[in-house]
A protein has these predicted regions:
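Conserved NTP-binding/hydrolysis core of motor NTPases
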Residues: 62-173
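Replication-associated primase and helicase/ATPase modules
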Residues: 1-46, 129-132
């Protein structure tokens, strides 16, 4: 909590802890994870297991480029006002390179992932999957391909007077 209010970039600290030049006498990963856990708990009501899972998921967003797979997290509730949006606000401060959208097209999502490698935070995705089936299937396809290194999503792009298939790398948390 102190790190967030003091303007310290917790994500940067997590990333530094995972590099070879990490100096344990100057940084304690367990302490950072504890502080991250406490920061989330300060703003969102979750049980201990949920807090642990989200804390570790946040850490994973800072290390995904060193892995073959990246986990996704889905936050759902049957009740309005349960704190999903508040959790999203907290995640936007703690994850690596956040990209938050409540209304995104497949075209935008593919290009943002390929260009920026963001942590994708999709608000109200349950409404998307209940709505336009074609749009939902495109987003689902991107997510299904993007959890693994080398995952691609193909789109047609204009080239001159015709269209050519282009494979986009969509590996991103």
């Amino acid at each position: 909590v102190d790190a967030i209010t003091a303007g310290v970039d917790i994500g940067e600290l997590i990333a530094k802890s995972l590099t070879q030049d990490w100096q344990p006498e100057r940084f304690d990963l367990a302490d950072l994870l504890d502080r991250t856990f406490a920061a989330i708990r300060r703003f969102v009501i979750l049980n201990h297991q949920q807090l642990n899972a989200i804390t570790l998921w946040i850490a994973s967003t800072h290390a995904f480029s060193a892995s073959q797979l990246t986990p996704y997290i889905s936050v759902t509730s049957a009740e309005r006002g349960s704190g999903k949006s508040r959790l999203l606000e907290v995640l936007m401060r703690l994850v690596a390179n956040p990209f938050n959208s409540s209304h995104v097209t497949a075209s935008v999502l593919v290009r943002r992932i390929a260009r920026d490698r963001p942590t994708v935070l999709l608000d109200e995705i349950d409404a998307l999957f209940k709505g336009n089936k074609e749009k939902a299937e495109h987003i689902r396809g991107i997510l299904n391909a993007g959890y693994a290194r080398g995952g691609t999503y193909s789109m047609s792009e204009p080239v001159g007077n015709s269209w050519e298939p282009v494979d986009y790398d969509v590996f991103s948390p």
